[in-house]
Amino acid sequence: MKYESAYFCGYAKLPSALPTTVTNSGLTLGLLLELGTGTILDASVTLLSELAIKMVKSYVIGKNIVDDYESISQEVLYRHQGVAAKPIIKALTDIRRAYIEYMEKNSVFLRG
């Protein structure tokens, strides 16, 4: 495989009650995905608190964007007790869809 990983982004509008909304009008979730497997290698998110960023990373890193999507979404709902939970899931949904579309279009070219 010529390229082993790619960076995918998902976006969601943030509630105005969040301090992050002052600097960012929306949430951006970025995931580094292993192309052949869909495994999430790393993550970035536009939240202000280092702890919130660390929590988001703990939800996703090492999991599969397709196979583990439901369990990741459930974990976010149960563990992320802030108003950013739904935007995180929306951004994750966008990334999952983008990854599936990308692989459908490009998997033939990625085989080497």
Regions found by a protein language model. Give the residues of each.
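Active-site- and interface-proximal helix/loop "cap" or "latch" segments in soluble metabolic
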Residues: L18-G30, L35-G112
